[in-house]
Protein backbone atom coordinates (compact mmCIF):
# COMPACT_ATOMS: atom_id res chain seq x y z
CA UNK A 1 0.00 0.00 0.00
CA UNK A 2 1.48 3.30 -1.00
CA UNK A 3 1.56 6.33 1.20
CA UNK A 4 -0.91 8.18 -0.99
CA UNK A 5 -3.48 5.41 -0.76
CA UNK A 6 -3.16 5.22 3.00
CA UNK A 7 -3.71 9.00 3.29
CA UNK A 8 -6.93 8.77 1.24
CA UNK A 9 -8.22 6.08 3.55
CA UNK A 10 -7.52 8.22 6.61
CA UNK A 11 -9.37 11.25 5.29
CA UNK A 12 -12.85 11.68 6.74
CA UNK A 13 -15.62 10.75 4.34
CA UNK A 14 -17.25 13.68 2.52
CA UNK A 15 -20.14 15.28 4.38
CA UNK A 16 -23.37 13.51 3.52
CA UNK A 17 -26.60 15.34 2.95
CA UNK A 18 -29.13 14.43 5.64
CA UNK A 19 -31.48 11.68 4.51
CA UNK A 20 -34.42 13.00 6.51
CA UNK A 21 -36.20 16.06 5.16
CA UNK A 22 -36.19 19.15 7.36
CA UNK A 23 -38.93 19.35 9.95
CA UNK A 24 -42.25 19.95 8.24
CA UNK A 25 -44.36 22.97 9.03
CA UNK A 26 -47.53 21.96 10.86
CA UNK A 27 -50.33 20.99 8.51
CA UNK A 28 -52.98 22.79 10.56
CA UNK A 29 -53.23 26.55 10.14
CA UNK A 30 -52.77 28.69 13.24
CA UNK A 31 -55.68 28.75 15.63
CA UNK A 32 -58.66 30.37 13.94
CA UNK A 33 -60.44 33.28 15.61
CA UNK A 34 -63.67 32.24 17.32
CA UNK A 35 -66.63 31.85 15.01
CA UNK A 36 -69.01 34.79 14.74
CA UNK A 37 -71.98 34.56 17.08
CA UNK A 38 -75.03 33.10 15.37
CA UNK A 39 -77.30 35.71 13.87
CA UNK A 40 -80.65 36.33 15.47
CA UNK A 41 -83.34 34.04 14.15
CA UNK A 42 -85.92 36.80 14.51
CA UNK A 43 -85.46 40.52 13.99
CA UNK A 44 -84.91 42.49 17.14
CA UNK A 45 -88.04 44.10 18.60
CA UNK A 46 -88.48 47.85 18.15
CA UNK A 47 -87.01 49.90 21.01
CA UNK A 48 -90.46 51.03 22.18
CA UNK A 49 -91.22 47.51 23.35
CA UNK A 50 -88.62 47.92 26.10
CA UNK A 51 -90.74 50.40 28.06
CA UNK A 52 -94.23 49.87 26.69
CA UNK A 53 -96.18 46.70 27.20
CA UNK A 54 -99.61 45.54 28.19
CA UNK A 55 -98.98 46.97 31.67
CA UNK A 56 -98.55 50.45 30.19
CA UNK A 57 -101.57 50.28 27.92
CA UNK A 58 -100.04 48.38 25.05
CA UNK A 59 -98.09 49.78 22.12
CA UNK A 60 -98.41 49.75 18.41
CA UNK A 61 -95.51 48.66 16.28
CA UNK A 62 -92.90 51.17 15.17
CA UNK A 63 -94.68 51.36 11.80
CA UNK A 64 -97.61 52.94 13.60
CA UNK A 65 -95.42 55.59 15.17
CA UNK A 66 -94.57 53.69 18.34
CA UNK A 67 -97.61 55.05 20.17
CA UNK A 68 -99.47 53.53 23.04
CA UNK A 69 -103.07 52.57 22.87
CA UNK A 70 -105.37 54.12 25.39
CA UNK A 71 -104.75 52.69 28.86
CA UNK A 72 -108.53 52.42 29.28
CA UNK A 73 -109.54 48.96 28.17
CA UNK A 74 -111.87 49.15 25.17
CA UNK A 75 -115.33 47.71 25.63
CA UNK A 76 -115.86 44.26 24.18
CA UNK A 77 -117.76 44.69 20.94
CA UNK A 78 -118.71 42.38 18.14
CA UNK A 79 -117.15 44.68 15.56
CA UNK A 80 -113.43 44.67 16.23
CA UNK A 81 -111.41 47.53 14.81
CA UNK A 82 -107.91 46.84 13.45
CA UNK A 83 -105.19 47.79 15.89
CA UNK A 84 -103.55 50.18 13.42
CA UNK A 85 -106.59 52.50 13.61
CA UNK A 86 -105.73 53.21 17.25
CA UNK A 87 -102.18 54.26 16.43
CA UNK A 88 -100.84 57.68 15.69
CA UNK A 89 -98.68 58.41 12.72
CA UNK A 90 -94.95 58.69 13.23
CA UNK A 91 -94.08 61.85 15.14
CA UNK A 92 -97.72 62.74 15.69
CA UNK A 93 -98.95 63.93 19.06
CA UNK A 94 -102.61 63.92 18.15
CA UNK A 95 -105.17 61.55 19.50
CA UNK A 96 -106.58 58.99 17.13
CA UNK A 97 -109.27 56.49 17.98
CA UNK A 98 -109.15 57.33 21.68
CA UNK A 99 -105.44 56.55 22.02
CA UNK A 100 -102.99 58.86 23.73
CA UNK A 101 -99.75 59.40 21.87
CA UNK A 102 -96.45 61.05 22.53
CA UNK A 103 -94.27 62.89 20.07
CA UNK A 104 -91.45 60.70 18.83
CA UNK A 105 -89.05 63.57 19.55
CA UNK A 106 -89.99 63.58 23.25
CA UNK A 107 -88.84 60.39 24.92
CA UNK A 108 -89.12 57.15 23.03
CA UNK A 109 -92.52 57.88 21.55
CA UNK A 110 -94.48 55.75 23.99
CA UNK A 111 -96.55 56.35 27.09
CA UNK A 112 -96.90 55.02 30.60
CA UNK A 113 -100.30 53.84 31.76
CA UNK A 114 -100.53 57.10 33.71
CA UNK A 115 -100.31 58.96 30.39
CA UNK A 116 -96.76 60.31 30.64
CA UNK A 117 -94.19 59.65 27.96
CA UNK A 118 -91.33 57.27 28.54
Swiss-Prot record:
Keywords (A to Z) from UniProt: Keratinization
Any Pfam family matching the protein: LCE
Tissue: Skin-specific. Expression was readily detected in adult trunk skin, adult arm skin, fetal skin, penal skin, vulva, esophagus and tongue. Not expressed in the cervix, rectum, lung, colon, or placenta. Expression is observed in the heart.
InterPro entries named in the record: LCE
GO biological process: keratinization
GO molecular function: identical protein binding
First and last residue of the signal peptide: none
Residue span of region Disordered: 1-32, 72-118
Source organism superkingdom: Eukaryota
Biased composition (Low complexity): 1-10, 97-118
Biased composition (Basic residues): 72-82
Residue spans of biased composition, Pro residues class: 11-32
Family, as annotated: Belongs to the LCE family.
Subunit structure, interactors included: Interacts with CYSRT1; the interaction is direct.
Additional remarks: Belongs to the LCE cluster present on 1q21.
Function: Precursors of the cornified envelope of the stratum corneum.
Protein's name according to its UniProt entry: Late cornified envelope protein 5A
Species the sequence originates in: Homo sapiens
Amino acid sequence: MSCQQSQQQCQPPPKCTPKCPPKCTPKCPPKCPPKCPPQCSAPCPPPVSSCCGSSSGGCCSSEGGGCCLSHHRPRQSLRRRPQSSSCCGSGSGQQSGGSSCCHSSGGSGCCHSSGGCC
